[in-house]
Amino acid sequence: MISFVSGRVAAVTPDSVIVEVGGFGVQLLATPATIARARVGERARFATSLVVREDSLTLYGFADDDERTVFELLQTASGVGPRLALAMLGVHSPTALRAAVATEDVKALALVPGIGRKTAQRIILELKDRLGTPSTAAAESTSGWRDAVHAGLLNLGYTARQADEAIAAIAGELDDSAAVDTATALRLALATLKRP
């Protein structure tokens, strides 16, 4: 197993980060929040999980060990593969996922594309005792999301002006909430940029 990858960020795509390691470009599929923190040309370290299939080897990258642990635990639920687990982490932070499972919040889990009511109920049933309880200290700050979203939009090819306008458009909605999930903020910002 490859536990982590450390090196210079060579490129960023909408769904992955490419890290130069020993002359090789290693592609890591990642969540929007993880991608938003990666800056081309700078050194970075990603916790990783290698998923081996009959026809492929896929490396998934995460901001920290906790995110990787939740990713791997999510896959122990029936019907949840690596793509769906990554989508769940793209919509909710590890803390938010733990809270949703602990409080049996079917609606929160059903916000993830590919998860309906029955799948959400099954995930809650199978993971309630294994996923752990949410940590209140791990909630993201309300101001930190702005920098992460700005960096993410710049890495995706948007100008600084476009990034600032998108952040301004969603700021009123997000600053009212106690904890802002970076992935959600980035998704909302991208949605404002795609409007005609």
UniProtKB/Swiss-Prot annotation:
Cited Gene3D superfamilies: 5' to 3' exonuclease, C-terminal subdomain, DNA helicase RuvA subunit, C-terminal domain, Nucleic acid-binding proteins
GO terms for biological process, alphabetical: DNA recombination; DNA repair
GO MF assignments: ATP binding; four-way junction DNA binding; four-way junction helicase activity
Main location: cytoplasm
Example of a GO cellular component annotation carried by this entry: Holliday junction helicase complex
Annotated region (Domain III), positions in chain: 141-196
Annotated region (Flexible linker), positions in chain: 136-140
Superkingdom assignment: Bacteria
Pfam families, per the entry: HHH_5, RuvA_C, RuvA_N
InterPro entries linked to this entry: DNA_helicase_Holl-junc_RuvA_I, Hlx-hairpin-Hlx_DNA-bd_motif, NA-bd_OB-fold, RuvA, RuvA_2-like, RuvA_C, RuvA_C_sf
Quaternary assembly: Homotetramer. Forms an RuvA(8)-RuvB(12)-Holliday junction (HJ) complex. HJ DNA is sandwiched between 2 RuvA tetramers; dsDNA enters through RuvA and exits via RuvB. An RuvB hexamer assembles on each DNA strand where it exits the tetramer. Each RuvB hexamer is contacted by two RuvA subunits (via domain III) on 2 adjacent RuvB subunits; this complex drives branch migration. In the full resolvosome a probable DNA-RuvA(4)-RuvB(12)-RuvC(2) complex forms which resolves the HJ.
Similarity section: Belongs to the RuvA family.
Domain notes: Has three domains with a flexible linker between the domains II and III and assumes an 'L' shape. Domain III is highly mobile and contacts RuvB.
Protein's name in the database: Holliday junction branch migration complex subunit RuvA
Organism: Acidothermus cellulolyticus (strain ATCC 43068 / DSM 8971 / 11B)
